[in-house]
Structures are given as structure tokens and as C-alpha cells.
């Protein structure tokens, strides 16, 4: 709370232990999820979640320094990440159907690593398409390819 409380007077922080990133892997880290809730917090999200990703990076770095070990922390603001994940999964399924029908690959816009991962996971069992990340740095994007 102290770490994030300075950001807004009316913000509350809800903390919970999340599900492991890879439920099939018993050694996968279990994240600490912090959801900052309150009015007028869009500035914490920023354009396409860039400010939120930066905030999460800073919090992880501060906690790692304090605790002298890495801590898997996921920060969300008014459930932005949950909503964005749902949007990405719906978009992935919609574009996968277009790729399957047309038989031609389609590249998505450049995305952050966690968003690309969401696309890969959403389509990993799709019978008609496969995914591949292409490009470098902040220009890296997912291409959906017919099988």
C-alpha cells in the first residue's frame, strides 16, 4: 500500500496470490497480484498499458532490492490487464479464423511480451493455424500462419 499509495489519494490496493503462469509446471512461480482500484487512474495504465508495465517493472525492482530475491509481482489497474487479455484472446480467435479461411498468414501489430504470449497461448491448440513471433525489440509481433 505504501509503495502505491502515493499515486492517488482515493486508490485502494487489493492483493492476492495468483495462479501459476504455467499450471502444468509444478515449479512455475506463483505471482503476487496487486490490483489498484479507484477513480481516475488511467494515467497509471498509459497508452496500451505502457505506464502500467513500467510501474510493474519498478515495483519488481524495488521489492527485489528490499527482499534480496526476485518476486513475481503482477500489477493491474481497475482490471485493465484482465480486460485486455480477454480482448486479445477474442482478436486472436477471430484472426485465426480469417487466416484459416484465406490460407494466408497475418501479422498483428507489435506487442509487449506478455501480450504476445497471450496470443500464442490462445491459439496453441488451434487445429488450422500456428503462431510465430517475428521482429526485434519493441517491433516484435505475432504472425498467425495456416498449418
Question: Which role does the model predict for each range below?
Answer:
Residues 1-147:
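RNA-contacting regions in translation and RNA-metabolism proteins
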Amino acid at each position: 500500500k505504501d509503495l502505491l499509495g502515493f499515486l492517488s489519494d482515493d486508490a485502494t490496493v487489493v492483493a492476492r496470490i495468483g495462479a501459476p503462469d504455467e499450471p502444468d509446471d509444478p515449479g512455475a512461480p506463483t505471482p503476487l497480484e496487486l490490483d489498484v482500484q479507484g477513480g481516475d487512474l488511467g494515467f497509471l495504465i498509459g497508452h496500451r498499458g505502457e505506464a502500467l508495465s513500467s510501474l510493474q517493472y519498478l515495483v519488481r525492482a524495488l521489492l527485489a532490492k528490499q527482499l534480496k530475491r526476485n518476486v513475481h509481482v503482477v500489477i493491474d489497474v481497475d482490471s485493465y490487464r484482465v480486460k485486455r487479455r480477454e480482448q486479445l484472446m477474442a482478436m486472436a480467435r477471430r484472426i485465426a479464423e480469417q487466416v484459416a479461411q484465406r490460407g494466408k498468414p497475418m501479422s498483428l501489430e507489435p506487442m509487449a511480451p506478455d501480450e504476445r504470449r497471450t496470443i500464442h497461448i490462445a491459439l496453441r491448440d488451434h487445429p488450422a493455424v500456428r503462431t510465430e513471433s517475428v521482429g526485434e525489440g519493441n517491433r516484435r509481433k505475432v504472425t498467425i500462419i495456416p498449418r
